């Protein structure tokens, strides 16, 4: 009987949480556009760890596709080798640089994690608009171009929000972890932009400062980035629905990641 009496309260709580998870809290724009100069390239950071064979050919193809869609804007790749044990070969790098000589290669000998790799690439970015995504370009090129347009319109940070197509590519374990992370982002960190783990984000110079100040080296660096940016009331953050490319494979996370990232989540909340 007591459980039945409590049921309406539980349903109301779930309704409130769902509304918070799905609302767009972005503020209207009141700033001038922050267009990159004609001589300035948009920087795209691409962290790599043990990339699949042919990764450099995919980058060359995607660069050509993106430049065509970006309508005259130039684009520079910043490729970060996070101490790969295989795949990131000298021949592959030479082929990439021959086709795209403006590409910057950042490499080091100790594996540090995706967060550290993105920050390493960020330290070499000089553009007023910078993005990062995975080396295998899981998102459609159109999503990347739309992100650039939102940043040019004045947003400080733009987040790729994963739609239903993303979750069809996930294993049951990853689905549970993704949904759980959104709930924890809201309940523990108070984030209204709860989908912080999508692998595509963009930012201007102001947004760059928040990413540069993160400390998490692995999975939850995205969450720390959005948490830091959301602490400033005048920072403009945009949630942008994004589509995955066809035939994208999203691997399972290794064992122990959940416990490690729960610890990082509490550290983010503790450090504030």
Model regions: which residues?
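Hydrophobic targeting segments
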Residues: 40-46, 62, 75-80
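Conserved donor nucleotide-binding strand/loop of the catalytic core
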Residues: 90-124
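Hydrophobic helical membrane-anchoring modules
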Residues: 1-42, 53, 190, 214-272
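A conserved acidic beta->alpha catalytic loop
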Residues: 81-92, 137
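Acceptor/aglycone-binding surface of glycosyltransferases and processive sugar-polymer synthases
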Residues: 110, 114-124, 141-219, 246-256, ...
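Short beta-strand/loop segment that forms part of the nucleotide-sugar
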Residues: 71-84, 106-108
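Short aromatic/hydrophobic "clamp" motif used to bind/position activated sugar donors
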Residues: 130
């Amino acid at each position: 009987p007591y459980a039945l009496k409590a049921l309406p309260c539980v349903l109301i709580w779930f309704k409130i949480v769902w509304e918070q998870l799905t609302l767009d809290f972005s503020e209207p724009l009141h700033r001038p556009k922050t267009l990159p100069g004609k001589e300035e390239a948009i920087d795209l950071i691409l962290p790599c760890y043990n990339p699949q064979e042919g990764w450099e050919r995919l980058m060359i193809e995607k660069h050509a596709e993106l430049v065509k869609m970006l309508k005259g804007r130039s684009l520079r790749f910043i490729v970060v080798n996070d101490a790969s044990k295989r795949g990131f070969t000298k021949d592959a790098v030479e082929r990439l640089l021959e086709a795209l000589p403006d590409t910057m290669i950042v490499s080091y000998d100790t594996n540090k994690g995706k967060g550290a790799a993105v920050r390493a690439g960020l330290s070499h970015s000089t553009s007023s608009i910078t993005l990062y995504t995975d080396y295998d370009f899981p998102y459609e090129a159109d999503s990347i171009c739309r992100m650039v347009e939102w940043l040019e319109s004045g947003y400080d940070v733009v987040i790729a929000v994963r739609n239903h197509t993303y979750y069809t590519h996930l294993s049951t374990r990853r689905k549970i972890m993704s949904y759980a992370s959104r709930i924890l982002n809201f309940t523990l960190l108070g984030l209204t932009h709860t989908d912080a783990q999508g692998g595509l984000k963009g930012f201007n110079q102001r947004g760059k400062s928040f990413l540069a100040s993160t400390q998490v080296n692995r999975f939850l660096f995205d969450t720390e980035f959005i948490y830091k940016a959301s602490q400033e009331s005048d920072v403009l953050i945009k949630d942008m629905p994004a589509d995955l490319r066809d035939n994208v494979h999203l691997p399972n996370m290794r064992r122990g990641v959940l416990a490690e990232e729960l610890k990082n989540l509490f550290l983010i909340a503790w450090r504030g």
